């Protein structure tokens, strides 16, 4: 067995072991939203990516009828969170659309539906011990795409994370690299390119 195959098998086995302790839950109560705000605060402060004011940690969009905040719990402890938007031609609420309106509207004007996972945050202390958290959390986007029969899943991606999204999700760049860039991937990863 090759060294690469051995490492891949080891990673997959470890991931499956972790999944035995993981529960995915939709966050709907005030108490759970406070926990989401706590994790967002710690993660965003460490990454220096958002102004850390109360209105930026939990906002009105968290309660939009087509936004779904999920928590990933490890042995009943919230370890990460992500917010999914089901974006349709008739319901265009999306943080990614706010950033790239022309590009996202092109998809929506073509009649496509999108899943827009945003506000990913992980407990930084747990992240050090369990680097698989992004895999565990972002798989929710794939499940949402299947559930809503979405045509695309969008991701705002920083340059240092682009290779991860290309490798794991077959991501394609739809906005050229710049101050912000964006990649998208197809739920079926068949490689077709459509507007």
Where are these regions (language model features)?
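A short helix-loop-beta-strand connector motif used in the catalytic cores of GNAT acetyltransferases and
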Residues: 61-71, 91-93
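Acyl-donor binding region in acyl/amide transferases
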Residues: 91, 95-191
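Short amphipathic alpha-helix that is part of the acyltransferase structural core
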Residues: 10-59, 69-73, 78
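Acidic, low-complexity proline/glycine-rich segments
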Residues: 1-9
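Beta-rich nucleic-acid/ligand-interaction surfaces
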Residues: 58-63, 160-163
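A short acidic/small-residue loop/turn micro-motif
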Residues: 86-88
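Short glycine-/small-residue motifs
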Residues: 81
